[in-house]
Amino acid sequence: TLLTDVGSTKAEVLAAAVRVFGKDVRERFLAGHPMAGKEQCGMEHADPDLFQGAAWFFSSSNGQDIYGGLSGEFIELVSAIGARTAGMDAAEHDKLCAWISHLPQMISTALAAALVDEYGEQAPLLEAGGRALREMTRIAGSPYSMWRDIALTNKDNLRDALLKLEQRLAHIRENLDTRELAMEFEKAHHLKKIVPRKRGELPKSQSRK
């Protein structure tokens, strides 16, 4: 029997699995994380295409061959439902997700909370923000009950990402009237060029389908 999970952080989960399964952890547990969440929860929001093209990370204990035995069979099943799979060290995974998943959630939450403080219940004014505002605050509706545990189990990486973003925002704030602002836009445009256009595309060295 193989046990797996779909949690957003992996280091603490793997450590707990080692405590539970001991020397058998490599054969009994496979840590997984599908990058295909939604801001809504519950069966009424189920989506049959949720995993189509989505990245699905797997992290192993030291020396575990995740593509062999029951782990390999499960990964083949994940690929069969349309997800793109990749193996990644747990610590590397948690740092990456702090930047590409957890930080965006905190940005959306902070922006939405700031708008409530600034404009309260003045919905007509907020609706004037249009598509940009809706896109930036879409995941602000995500449940705290889920994100509480993510923040607790990845707090060091998330704090580091938040600190670096704070420094970046401070730099922008101090350079609204200088050439530095244009350079920030140039960096942002470069990211748009290198980020995969389709959901779930992974570097060939990491991906397996």
Question: Residue spans of the language-model regions?
Answer:
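Rossmann-like NAD(P)(H) cofactor-binding subdomain of soluble oxidoreductases
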Residues: 1-44
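Glycine-rich beta-alpha junction loops
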Residues: 10, 33-39, 62, 92, ...
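Helix-enriched interaction subdomains in cytosolic or periplasmic regions
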Residues: 15-18, 185, 193, 208
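Short, flexible, solvent-exposed loop/turn segments with mixed acidic/basic and small polar residues
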Residues: 44-50, 149
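Internal alpha-helical scaffold of NAD(P)-dependent oxidoreductase catalytic cores
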Residues: 48-138
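Interdomain hinge/lid region at the active-site interface
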Residues: 122-192
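Long, positively charged, glycine-interspersed low-complexity recognition regions
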Residues: 193-209
